[in-house]
Structure formats: structure tokens, C-alpha cells
């Protein structure tokens, strides 16, 4: 079944805006609590019959469904876990097999994106940015860059995807000396304390807010505001950590490709004790497989930017980035 996201209360007034509530704030209209995932036929049906499908009826449908198949409480093969293919496709699926020809996964329904996005990625693979040609699998706790365009086959209401991964990026041995300066105290830190601070910084730097590497960064803040209080959040947060631990940074490094998390081989577990922020920080409990150390568990305190900070930071970074590109282009022209 292919899922389509629909609004319980319309996002804006106007012709065809079903169940619009003028008392809702813009944040409430765009919040995950105002969304419901349906099949293509039902999504059209509820938009045509607001008398039969009232706000309360739709909210009760959503509560009943979440109670019956809550992610994390149901480990059945039918439900599966999250799989991301590139930056625009997230689906629920599970691994069918792995061998010399590569791996094969079955996608049961889409959380973000749709079947047309999956097929477009296959046919336009060479036009995709290199850093977006990846696959992430929560079931295994890791991912990697695709070695070529995946093969996609429709199997009833599901899609089966076969792919090969490139050689994994080297990980840094966490037992080797690592030092840094504590952002809070200014004191020198080393070992896992330095790596933990690196994890927190990588997760807290929102994508598109640093002008020097505008395509780098984390999506955790965006995910927090979109999926706050939802059982989907911890799975999507885990997927984001898998991306940061498996996909090399865009930046060029003298020592070769390196991932933002540097020393993490696998992300085995992520828990969200509470969605409440303390000083704009979200506490997360994680279990990683660390190069040189093996299994490691600990807590991370990650800065979460507000929607206003994200918009302002991205606008400022974009201006600086464009100015730098303009200056560099002018310098090249002067040399000709």
C-alpha cells in the first residue's frame, strides 16, 4: 500500500479547503498532529466528504491505527523498519536478502516521497548529486553510497529494490588519541568525550546554515518540529544518525573520505526519553558500534534550532554563499 499524507484540517482557506479551522496557528496546521496517512483512494474520499469524515472521526482513525501498529512496539516482518533511498524517499520495508549480486529490500509503503520519486531516481541516477546517491537501513543500523542505479520491480502493492553499495568509508579508530576543546568550559577534552561532542555538533548543525558548506549539516531540527511527539521521530532520528555515520562528508579531507560521525560503524538503537527541550537541547539515548571499541551506549544533548532560527540561518548562509561564489567567479575571470 502506497501512503499519501493528507491534512486533517486544511492547511489554508479557499475553495476545496476541507475542515479548515481559522483558530489554528500556522504551526498547528503544519504539525504532524494535523496529518494522516492514507491510500490514494481514501485520501481523495475524505477530501470530498467532510460531513462523513469530520475532524474528530479522522483523529480517532489515526489514534486507532497508531495504537494497533505502533513503530517500535511491533517487530513483525510485515511492518518492517525504515529505509531511505536518497534524500527524498523514506519508506517502511525490510531486507529480503544479500549476496554477491548485492542486497534486496521490499518497500511496503512510503513515509516521504512516492513511487514516482523512486523510479525517477533510477532513471535520472547520473544526474543526482553524488552525496545523495545513498541508501540507509534502520534494520541493519548502517547504509552507504550506491554503486550504481538500483533495480526496481513492482511486486503487487510493494516495490522490491536491488542494489550494490560502494566500499564503505574508513572509520577512525576511537582508541587513537583524539583531543578537542569543550564548548561549555573551554577545557581540553579527549577520548570518547571528544567524540561525543563531535556527535552532538554534527547533529546540532542544521543543514544549509553554514555558508562554507551549504549542502552539509543535519536534518534533526527539521525532523523534531515535523514529528514532535510522534512515534516516527525516534526512527527518523536513528536514520539521520545512520546517514551521518555512513555517508562521507562533501568536504575534501587530506586523509581521504570521512563521515561526520568519524568513528561510528553502526547505529544500533536510539531512544527519546522526552520531547521536552532544556535550553533548546534534546536529550537522546544511543547505542553505537564504535571502531576500535565495539558496542558503546551513552547520552547525547543536541541543540535544536527553532523554525525561525532555521529560516534566518539558511537565508543568511545562502547570501554569504552566493557572495563567495560571485567573488570567486570574478577572480577567475580576472585571471583569464
Regions found by a protein language model. Give the residues of each.
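Amphipathic alpha-helical interaction segments
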Residues: 45-49, 206, 210, 248
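Intrinsically disordered or highly flexible coil/loop and linker segments, enriched in small
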Residues: 71-78, 208-212, 250
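Histidine-centered nuclease catalytic patch
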Residues: 1-35, 46-63
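Domain-exit/linker segments immediately C-terminal to small folded modules
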Residues: 52-100
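Short, cysteine/histidine-rich loop/knuckle motifs that typically chelate Zn2+
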Residues: 41
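Short, non-transmembrane alpha-helical segments in secretory-pathway proteins
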Residues: 232-260
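Immediate N-terminus of the mature polypeptide
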Residues: 81-231, 256-336
